Amino acid sequence: MSGALASFSAADLGGFAIAAALERAGVAPGEVEHVIMGQVLMAGQGQVPSRQAAVKAGIPMSVPSVNVNKVCLSGLNAIYLANQMIAAGEADIVVAGGMESMTNAPYIADGARAGFRD
């Protein structure tokens, strides 16, 4: 039960979305000043998935990156934080959004550590 995007991590999908958004907006990756990405299921995704997505989109490693991790509205909260940065004059171009790959989320079977016995 896997779809066409099953082989892509959340960071891969985030990178695709960031690259497409930058292209559509006519913004070069080097113009981005900050990246804020929400993601709920970060277990097993490696370090700083927001940075991974940014780099996959061609944004330089020198650009700061932050993850927002909460059960609901991580992506929306990332957008809110980006809006605050822009409104406060801290940045002009901030990439913000959410990313997830439910197909690649860890599968956890509670009680499996001790084994399942009758």
Locations of regions flagged by a protein language model:
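Glycine-rich, flexible loop/turn motifs
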Residues: 1-4, 59-64, 103-104, 112
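Short catalytic helix/loop segments, enriched in acidic residues and glycine
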Residues: 2-23, 116-117
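Conserved catalytic cysteine-centered active-site region
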Residues: 8-9, 36-93
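Phosphate/pyrophosphate-binding loops at sites that engage ATP/ADP/AMP, CoA/4′-phosphopantetheine
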Residues: 19-33
